[in-house]
Amino acid sequence: MDSVSKISRKINLFTKHIGTYSKINTSTTYYATVKLLVNNPCNIDQDTIFNLLEYSVIILDLDGFYQIIKHHNDIFRDNYRLIRYILYIAYQNHHQDCSVYYEMIKYLIDYGLDITFNDNFAIKLASLCHENILKLVIDNGGDVHADNEFPICLAANHGRLSCVKLLVDCGVDPFCFDNIVIKLASIDYYDNVVEYMVSIGADINAGNNYVLRYAIKNLDKKMIELAINAGASINDISPNDITHIIKYQSPTIMNILVEYGLDISTVNFCSKIRPERKKFVDNLISRGVDPTIIAYLSYACESD
Protein backbone atom coordinates (compact mmCIF):
# COMPACT_ATOMS: atom_id res chain seq x y z
CA MET A 1 0.00 0.00 0.00
CA ASP A 2 1.20 3.52 -0.74
CA SER A 3 2.36 5.78 2.07
CA VAL A 4 -0.03 8.28 3.66
CA SER A 5 1.47 11.11 1.62
CA LYS A 6 0.97 9.23 -1.64
CA ILE A 7 -2.62 8.34 -0.76
CA SER A 8 -3.26 11.96 0.19
CA ARG A 9 -1.96 13.11 -3.19
CA LYS A 10 -4.14 10.51 -4.90
CA ILE A 11 -7.18 11.81 -2.98
CA ASN A 12 -6.35 15.42 -3.88
CA LEU A 13 -6.08 14.51 -7.56
CA PHE A 14 -9.42 12.70 -7.43
CA THR A 15 -11.31 15.58 -5.78
CA LYS A 16 -9.62 18.14 -8.02
CA HIS A 17 -10.69 16.16 -11.09
CA ILE A 18 -14.34 15.87 -10.07
CA GLY A 19 -14.53 19.63 -9.63
CA THR A 20 -14.59 19.99 -13.41
CA TYR A 21 -18.18 18.70 -13.42
CA SER A 22 -19.57 21.79 -11.71
CA LYS A 23 -19.34 24.28 -14.55
CA ILE A 24 -23.00 24.66 -15.48
CA ASN A 25 -24.31 28.12 -16.35
CA THR A 26 -27.37 29.54 -14.63
CA SER A 27 -30.48 29.27 -16.77
CA THR A 28 -33.10 32.01 -16.80
CA THR A 29 -35.30 30.13 -19.27
CA TYR A 30 -35.28 26.70 -17.64
CA TYR A 31 -38.97 26.38 -16.79
CA ALA A 32 -40.13 27.87 -20.08
CA THR A 33 -37.88 25.49 -22.02
CA VAL A 34 -39.08 22.47 -20.03
CA LYS A 35 -42.66 23.46 -20.76
CA LEU A 36 -41.83 23.78 -24.46
CA LEU A 37 -40.13 20.38 -24.37
CA VAL A 38 -43.16 18.69 -22.85
CA ASN A 39 -45.56 20.29 -25.32
CA ASN A 40 -43.38 20.19 -28.45
CA PRO A 41 -40.47 17.76 -27.91
CA CYS A 42 -39.45 17.82 -31.55
CA ASN A 43 -38.52 21.49 -31.25
CA ILE A 44 -35.75 20.91 -28.67
CA ASP A 45 -32.41 19.39 -29.66
CA GLN A 46 -30.70 16.67 -27.62
CA ASP A 47 -27.90 18.89 -26.32
CA THR A 48 -30.40 21.37 -24.92
CA ILE A 49 -32.35 18.54 -23.30
CA PHE A 50 -29.19 17.26 -21.66
CA ASN A 51 -28.36 20.74 -20.36
CA LEU A 52 -31.85 20.93 -18.88
CA LEU A 53 -31.24 17.63 -17.11
CA GLU A 54 -28.07 18.93 -15.52
CA TYR A 55 -29.76 22.14 -14.46
CA SER A 56 -32.62 20.21 -12.86
CA VAL A 57 -29.99 18.57 -10.64
CA ILE A 58 -28.66 21.94 -9.48
CA ILE A 59 -32.08 23.26 -8.47
CA LEU A 60 -33.31 19.92 -7.06
CA ASP A 61 -36.22 19.78 -9.50
CA LEU A 62 -37.08 16.09 -9.34
CA ASP A 63 -40.39 16.46 -11.19
CA GLY A 64 -38.64 18.36 -13.96
CA PHE A 65 -35.90 15.72 -14.07
CA TYR A 66 -38.52 13.01 -14.64
CA GLN A 67 -40.22 15.04 -17.38
CA ILE A 68 -36.99 15.92 -19.18
CA ILE A 69 -35.16 12.62 -19.08
CA LYS A 70 -37.74 10.64 -21.02
CA HIS A 71 -37.10 12.89 -24.00
CA HIS A 72 -33.34 12.26 -24.16
CA ASN A 73 -32.13 9.37 -26.29
CA ASP A 74 -28.75 8.81 -24.59
CA ILE A 75 -28.72 9.58 -20.87
CA PHE A 76 -25.34 7.85 -20.45
CA ARG A 77 -23.62 10.04 -23.03
CA ASP A 78 -20.26 11.75 -22.59
CA ASN A 79 -18.77 8.99 -20.48
CA TYR A 80 -21.66 8.86 -17.99
CA ARG A 81 -21.57 12.61 -17.48
CA LEU A 82 -25.05 12.85 -15.93
CA ILE A 83 -24.52 10.36 -13.10
CA ARG A 84 -21.09 11.81 -12.43
CA TYR A 85 -22.64 15.25 -12.22
CA ILE A 86 -25.42 14.15 -9.85
CA LEU A 87 -22.87 12.52 -7.57
CA TYR A 88 -20.71 15.63 -7.65
CA ILE A 89 -23.57 17.92 -6.63
CA ALA A 90 -24.55 15.41 -3.92
CA TYR A 91 -20.96 15.49 -2.68
CA GLN A 92 -20.98 19.29 -2.58
CA ASN A 93 -24.19 19.19 -0.53
CA HIS A 94 -23.53 16.08 1.54
CA HIS A 95 -24.73 17.74 4.76
CA GLN A 96 -28.19 18.44 3.31
CA ASP A 97 -31.21 16.26 2.55
CA CYS A 98 -30.08 13.84 -0.15
CA SER A 99 -33.49 12.43 -1.09
CA VAL A 100 -33.71 14.16 -4.49
CA TYR A 101 -30.21 13.07 -5.53
CA TYR A 102 -31.02 9.58 -4.26
CA GLU A 103 -34.11 9.34 -6.47
CA MET A 104 -32.26 10.67 -9.51
CA ILE A 105 -29.50 8.10 -9.10
CA LYS A 106 -32.04 5.34 -8.47
CA TYR A 107 -33.83 6.29 -11.69
CA LEU A 108 -30.61 5.91 -13.67
CA ILE A 109 -29.87 2.56 -12.03
CA ASP A 110 -33.38 1.31 -12.77
CA TYR A 111 -32.94 2.53 -16.34
CA GLY A 112 -29.91 0.27 -16.71
CA LEU A 113 -26.88 2.13 -15.39
CA ASP A 114 -23.92 -0.13 -14.61
CA ILE A 115 -22.87 1.39 -11.30
CA THR A 116 -19.34 0.01 -11.71
CA PHE A 117 -18.62 2.24 -14.72
CA ASN A 118 -15.15 3.77 -15.04
CA ASP A 119 -13.44 1.47 -12.55
CA ASN A 120 -16.08 1.95 -9.83
CA PHE A 121 -15.99 5.73 -10.02
CA ALA A 122 -19.49 5.95 -8.50
CA ILE A 123 -18.66 4.34 -5.17
CA LYS A 124 -15.52 6.44 -4.84
CA LEU A 125 -17.46 9.68 -5.16
CA ALA A 126 -20.44 8.30 -3.22
CA SER A 127 -18.13 7.73 -0.25
CA LEU A 128 -18.02 11.54 0.04
CA CYS A 129 -21.81 11.90 -0.12
CA HIS A 130 -24.61 11.15 2.33
CA GLU A 131 -24.46 7.55 3.54
CA ASN A 132 -27.85 6.78 1.96
CA ILE A 133 -26.40 7.47 -1.48
CA LEU A 134 -23.36 5.34 -0.69
CA LYS A 135 -25.65 2.51 0.42
CA LEU A 136 -27.66 2.80 -2.81
CA VAL A 137 -24.47 2.44 -4.84
CA ILE A 138 -23.27 -0.51 -2.74
CA ASP A 139 -26.64 -2.26 -2.92
CA ASN A 140 -26.49 -2.06 -6.70
CA GLY A 141 -23.04 -3.50 -7.19
CA GLY A 142 -20.52 -0.86 -6.16
CA ASP A 143 -17.31 -2.53 -5.00
CA VAL A 144 -16.50 -1.45 -1.44
CA HIS A 145 -12.90 -2.60 -1.96
CA ALA A 146 -12.39 -0.71 -5.23
CA ASP A 147 -8.90 0.54 -6.07
CA ASN A 148 -7.17 -0.77 -2.95
CA GLU A 149 -9.84 0.31 -0.43
CA PHE A 150 -9.97 3.80 -1.93
CA PRO A 151 -13.61 4.50 -0.89
CA ILE A 152 -12.87 4.25 2.85
CA CYS A 153 -9.67 6.25 2.37
CA LEU A 154 -11.70 9.04 0.76
CA ALA A 155 -14.39 8.91 3.44
CA ALA A 156 -11.86 9.04 6.29
CA ASN A 157 -9.84 11.85 4.73
CA HIS A 158 -13.00 13.97 4.37
CA GLY A 159 -14.45 13.15 7.79
CA ARG A 160 -17.47 11.21 6.54
CA LEU A 161 -17.94 9.12 9.68
CA SER A 162 -21.28 7.61 8.62
CA CYS A 163 -19.75 6.46 5.33
CA VAL A 164 -16.72 5.01 7.11
CA LYS A 165 -19.05 3.04 9.39
CA LEU A 166 -21.14 1.82 6.46
CA LEU A 167 -18.08 0.62 4.55
CA VAL A 168 -16.84 -1.21 7.65
CA ASP A 169 -20.28 -2.80 8.07
CA CYS A 170 -20.07 -3.92 4.44
CA GLY A 171 -16.81 -5.76 4.99
CA VAL A 172 -13.99 -3.27 4.56
CA ASP A 173 -11.12 -3.90 6.98
CA PRO A 174 -10.89 -0.67 9.04
CA PHE A 175 -7.29 -1.48 9.97
CA CYS A 176 -6.10 -2.14 6.43
CA PHE A 177 -2.65 -1.11 5.28
CA ASP A 178 -1.20 -0.41 8.72
CA ASN A 179 -4.24 1.56 9.92
CA ILE A 180 -4.31 3.97 6.98
CA VAL A 181 -7.90 5.00 7.85
CA ILE A 182 -7.13 6.54 11.24
CA LYS A 183 -4.04 8.25 9.82
CA LEU A 184 -6.01 9.89 7.01
CA ALA A 185 -8.75 11.00 9.42
CA SER A 186 -6.23 12.68 11.70
CA ILE A 187 -4.71 14.90 9.00
CA ASP A 188 -7.52 17.49 9.08
CA TYR A 189 -8.62 16.74 12.65
CA TYR A 190 -11.70 14.64 12.04
CA ASP A 191 -11.81 13.72 15.70
CA ASN A 192 -15.10 11.81 15.42
CA VAL A 193 -13.57 9.43 12.88
CA VAL A 194 -10.39 9.04 14.93
CA GLU A 195 -12.40 8.35 18.09
CA TYR A 196 -14.57 5.80 16.26
CA MET A 197 -11.51 4.04 14.87
CA VAL A 198 -9.93 3.85 18.32
CA SER A 199 -13.20 2.52 19.76
CA ILE A 200 -13.19 -0.43 17.34
CA GLY A 201 -9.57 -1.28 17.94
CA ALA A 202 -7.41 0.84 15.63
CA ASP A 203 -3.79 1.18 16.73
CA ILE A 204 -3.25 4.85 17.59
CA ASN A 205 0.50 4.20 17.53
CA ALA A 206 0.53 2.69 14.03
CA GLY A 207 3.12 3.83 11.54
CA ASN A 208 5.70 4.93 14.10
CA ASN A 209 3.04 6.89 16.01
CA TYR A 210 1.94 8.71 12.86
CA VAL A 211 -1.16 10.38 14.34
CA LEU A 212 0.63 12.00 17.27
CA ARG A 213 3.77 12.94 15.38
CA TYR A 214 1.79 14.43 12.47
CA ALA A 215 -0.22 16.46 14.99
CA ILE A 216 3.04 17.72 16.51
CA LYS A 217 4.33 18.63 13.06
CA ASN A 218 1.20 20.75 12.52
CA LEU A 219 1.15 22.07 16.11
CA ASP A 220 -2.39 20.70 16.37
CA LYS A 221 -3.20 20.98 20.08
CA LYS A 222 -6.55 19.19 19.92
CA MET A 223 -5.28 16.21 17.93
CA ILE A 224 -2.23 15.91 20.18
CA GLU A 225 -4.45 15.69 23.25
CA LEU A 226 -6.86 13.30 21.54
CA ALA A 227 -4.03 11.00 20.43
CA ILE A 228 -2.36 10.92 23.85
CA ASN A 229 -5.66 10.33 25.64
CA ALA A 230 -6.33 7.48 23.19
CA GLY A 231 -3.04 5.84 24.12
CA ALA A 232 -0.42 7.36 21.82
CA SER A 233 3.05 6.83 23.25
CA ILE A 234 4.97 9.89 24.38
CA ASN A 235 8.14 7.83 24.14
CA ASP A 236 7.92 7.81 20.34
CA ILE A 237 8.39 11.58 20.16
CA SER A 238 11.87 12.09 18.79
CA PRO A 239 14.42 14.84 19.46
CA ASN A 240 13.70 16.07 15.93
CA ASP A 241 9.98 16.39 16.81
CA ILE A 242 10.90 18.48 19.85
CA THR A 243 13.17 20.61 17.68
CA HIS A 244 10.18 21.36 15.45
CA ILE A 245 8.18 22.64 18.43
CA ILE A 246 11.08 24.82 19.56
CA LYS A 247 11.69 26.11 16.05
CA TYR A 248 8.09 27.30 15.72
CA GLN A 249 8.04 28.60 19.29
CA SER A 250 4.92 26.87 20.58
CA PRO A 251 5.01 26.93 24.40
CA THR A 252 1.42 25.67 24.60
CA ILE A 253 2.26 22.48 22.73
CA MET A 254 5.48 22.06 24.70
CA ASN A 255 3.70 22.47 28.04
CA ILE A 256 1.03 19.93 27.10
CA LEU A 257 3.61 17.32 26.15
CA VAL A 258 5.68 17.96 29.28
CA GLU A 259 2.54 17.56 31.40
CA TYR A 260 2.01 14.17 29.79
CA GLY A 261 5.57 13.15 30.66
CA LEU A 262 7.75 14.18 27.72
CA ASP A 263 11.43 14.59 28.56
CA ILE A 264 12.37 17.57 26.41
CA SER A 265 16.04 17.24 27.31
CA THR A 266 16.27 14.55 24.64
CA VAL A 267 16.48 17.44 22.19
CA ASN A 268 20.18 17.44 23.08
CA PHE A 269 20.47 14.42 20.79
CA CYS A 270 18.84 16.08 17.77
CA SER A 271 20.29 14.88 14.47
CA LYS A 272 19.18 17.86 12.39
CA ILE A 273 21.96 20.25 13.38
CA ARG A 274 23.69 21.62 10.29
CA PRO A 275 27.46 21.19 10.51
CA GLU A 276 28.26 24.63 9.05
CA ARG A 277 25.93 26.38 11.50
CA LYS A 278 27.20 24.29 14.40
CA LYS A 279 30.70 25.40 13.51
CA PHE A 280 29.59 29.04 13.59
CA VAL A 281 27.91 28.66 17.00
CA ASP A 282 30.91 26.78 18.40
CA ASN A 283 33.09 29.64 17.20
CA LEU A 284 30.90 32.17 19.04
CA ILE A 285 31.07 30.15 22.24
CA SER A 286 34.85 29.74 21.96
CA ARG A 287 35.12 33.54 21.76
CA GLY A 288 33.20 34.00 24.99
CA VAL A 289 29.57 34.39 23.87
CA ASP A 290 27.18 32.91 26.43
CA PRO A 291 25.22 29.94 24.86
CA THR A 292 22.09 31.27 26.56
CA ILE A 293 22.46 34.58 24.74
CA ILE A 294 22.80 32.71 21.45
CA ALA A 295 19.49 30.97 22.19
CA TYR A 296 17.83 34.28 23.07
CA LEU A 297 19.10 35.84 19.87
CA SER A 298 17.62 32.95 17.89
CA TYR A 299 14.19 32.84 19.55
CA ALA A 300 13.61 35.95 21.65
CA CYS A 301 15.36 38.82 19.92
CA GLU A 302 13.24 41.90 19.17
CA SER A 303 13.11 43.16 15.60
CA ASP A 304 14.76 46.47 14.80
UniProtKB/Swiss-Prot annotation:
Positions annotated as ANK repeat: 82-117, 118-146, 147-176, 178-206, 207-236, 238-266
Pfam families, alphabetized: Ank_2 (PF12796)
Name of the protein this chain belongs to: Putative ankyrin repeat protein R602
Alphabetized PANTHER family for the sequence: ANK_REP_REGION DOMAIN-CONTAINING PROTEIN (PTHR24126:SF14), ANKYRIN REPEAT, PH AND SEC7 DOMAIN CONTAINING PROTEIN SECG-RELATED (PTHR24126)
Keywords, alphabetical: ANK repeat, Repeat
SUPFAM superfamilies tied to this protein: Ankyrin repeat
